């Protein structure tokens, strides 16, 4: 009888990446790379950046980011998206994510 092993958490396929512009996102490791080595991100930072990377060249509204990352509807008084964007910019560079006034945010390619 084979030995019992603890179930392993489900993860993305080994080596699965998303590339958008200068950014490469490693799905399994939750890291981003802009050509200077991997930068670890929190889960929420990674999910937000992934949402932007899946729409390269297009602005993504705060409402869409809130729904995709946090799972709730847009609250005009919430600054959670702004704070997360600021943290990503501080880790990966301020020029990476463009603020599109009146629309949302865009990953610069």
Regions found by a protein language model. Give the residues of each.
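Basic, amphipathic DNA-recognition helix from helix-turn-helix-like DNA-binding domains
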Residues: 1-19
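A generic fold-level signal
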Residues: 12, 18, 41-43, 92, ...
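A structural micro-motif at secondary-structure boundaries
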Residues: 18-46, 106-109
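Glycine/small-residue-rich pyrophosphate-binding loop that anchors the diphosphate of NDP-sugar donors
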Residues: 21, 56, 103
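Catalytic-loop Lys-Pro-X-Asn motif of eukaryotic-like protein kinases
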Residues: 27, 62, 102
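Positively charged, aromatic-enriched patches within helix-turn-helix-type DNA-binding elements
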Residues: 31-43, 47-84, 90-95
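A short linear beta-strand->loop->alpha-helix hinge motif most characteristic
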Residues: 96-109
């Amino acid at each position: 009888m084979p030995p019992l092993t603890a179930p392993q958490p489900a993860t993305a396929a080994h080596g699965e990446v998303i590339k958008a512009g200068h950014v490469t996102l490693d799905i399994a490791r939750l890291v981003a790379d802009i050509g200077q080595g991997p930068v670890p991100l929190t889960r929420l930072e990674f999910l937000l950046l992934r949402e932007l990377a899946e729409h390269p060249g297009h602005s993504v509204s705060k409402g869409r980011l809130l729904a995709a990352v946090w799972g709730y509807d847009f609250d005009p008084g919430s600054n959670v998206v702004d704070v997360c964007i600021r943290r990503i910019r501080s880790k990966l560079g301020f020029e990476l994510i463009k603020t599109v006034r009146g629309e949302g945010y865009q990953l610069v390619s």
